[in-house]
Curated annotation (Swiss-Prot):
Gene name for this UniProt entry: nuoD
This protein's UniProt keywords: Cell inner membrane, Cell membrane, Membrane, NAD, Quinone, Translocase, Transport, Ubiquinone
Organism of this sequence: Dinoroseobacter shibae (strain DSM 16493 / NCIMB 14021 / DFL 12)
Subcellular location: Cell inner membrane
Catalytic activity: a quinone + NADH + 5 H(+)(in) = a quinol + NAD(+) + 4 H(+)(out)
Protein known as: NADH-quinone oxidoreductase subunit D
Length: 404
């Protein structure tokens, strides 16, 4: 019988259209590295968003079990390679907690200084590439110019622009060169005008606001459910910052504000990052003042750290200690510890389990971007395809730390 009764759409008069699946990335310029999203689209609306990770997986946590504690330090530079020193910081704090090492004050201040430089490095890249993802081409050019100056400060402190390995258990590897503090201070007085320029281009820009306001809204309940940290939390109005909530190093001596948003959308997260850069500048300027007053060693001399060059030329024991330290490495007392820092992307934590040998028994890395990306399906559902790029941009994902 051919009267059409066995065709549903003939009865309803509407045709059922199958949703179609597309790949977003890994070659997409807005995918920030090797992100692959499988998107199910209903026309232009995202119905489902499935992140496929692991394209940059290098087995870091497993590799760390067969290296000494010091040899593991450079792996942390390669996680979030946008602001490398912040990650080393967490590893050093974990080792210092287990061994009970006290960092000398000057070393502690240098760490704070470079962590804040790292925060500005990260936020500059994030804000400017976020602008590029939604169609503004000028900010990235300005942002990279400023990042270049900061990279030079990295290089002058430790000889490397990117993979620094500058923080060591017990402090930092070497003291800062004499003129470096003056140059950082001079830069910190010039930088606000650059931020004002970026501010003028983006903050009240109609197109930028249309692309970011009410996109990727995150509520306070969702923050707790998905385990967000960092700007994703502060953009929604919760003033949670580990530098203030669980002060580590000497952050409790510094005077700075914690910027918070109120709508929890992409635009608020952009505003929070802009303001955080200004707060980081305050911390940098305070750290420079404190460093000028504080003299002394930058590394806690002891079993964890190498003897000075002068000692090695005169003392046989110092030479033996140096040789043992760089071949066998130092032994860490058995136990387990969790150390976390407020990295630019969120709470970067290290869970370290030691069995008393010179190698970690297990090290678990808590990457903030991993938890943010995992909620992509929840956040992007119901948005348009073009908004996916804006959401990923403000989540601030870097695949070194997500795939690790």
């Amino acid at each position: 019988m051919m009267d059409g009764t066995n065709f549903d759409d003939a009865l309803t008069g509407e045709q059922k259209i199958r949703n179609f699946n597309i790949n977003f990335g890994p070659q997409h310029p807005a995918a920030h590295g090797v992100l692959r999203l499988v998107l199910e689209l209903d026309g232009e609306i995202v119905e489902r968003c499935d992140p496929h990770i692991g394209l940059l997986h290098r087995g870091t946590e497993k590799l760390m079990e067969s290296r000494t504690y010091l040899q593991n330090l450079p792996y942390f530079d390669r996680l979030d390679y946008v602001a490398p020193m912040n990650q080393e910081h967490a590893w050093c704090l974990a080792i210092e907690k287990l061994t009970g090492t006290v960092v000398p004050r000057r070393g502690s201040l240098i760490r704070v200084l470079y962590c804040e430089i790292g925060r500005i490095l990260n936020h500059l890249l994030n804000i400017t590439t976020q602008a590029m993802d939604v169609g503004a081409l000028t900010p990235p050019l300005w942002g990279f110019e400023e990042r270049e100056k900061l990279m030079v400060f990295y290089e002058r402190a430790c000889g490397a622009r990117l993979h620094a390995a500058y923080f060591r258990p017990g402090g930092v590897h070497q003291d800062l060169p004499p003129d470096l503090l003056d140059d950082i201070e001079a830069w910190s007085h010039e930088f606000p005008s650059v931020m004002d320029d970026i501010d003028g281009l983006l903050t009240e820009n109609r197109i930028f606001k249309q692309r970011n306001c009410d996109i990727g809204v995150v509520t306070e309940e969702e923050i707790l459910e998905w385990g967000y940290s960092g700007v994703m939390v502060r953009g929604s109005g919760l003033a949670w910052d580990l530098r203030r909530a669980q002060p580590y190093e000497c952050y409790d001596e510094f005077d700075f504000q914690i910027p918070v948003g109120k709508n929890g959308d992409c635009y608020d997260r952009y505003l929070v990052r802009m303001q955080e850069m200004r707060e980081s500048l305050k911390i940098i300027q305070q750290a420079i003042v404190k460093l000028r007053e504080t003299k002394g060693d930058v590394l806690a001399r002891g079993k964890l750290t190498p003897p000075s060059r002068a000692d090695m030329k005169t003392s046989m024991e110092a030479l033996i200690h140096h040789f043992k330290l760089y071949t066998e490495g130092f032994h860490v007392p058995a136990g387990e510890v969790y150390a976390a820092v407020e990295a630019p992307k969120g709470e970067f934590g290290v869970f370290l389990k030691s069995d008393g040998t010179n190698r970690p028994y297990r090290a678990k890395i808590r990457a903030p971007g991993y938890l943010h990306l995992q909620s992509m399906d929840h956040v992007a559902k119901g948005h348009q395809l073009a908004d996916v790029a804006a959401i990923i941009g403000t989540m601030d994902v870097v695949f070194g730390e997500i795939d690790r």
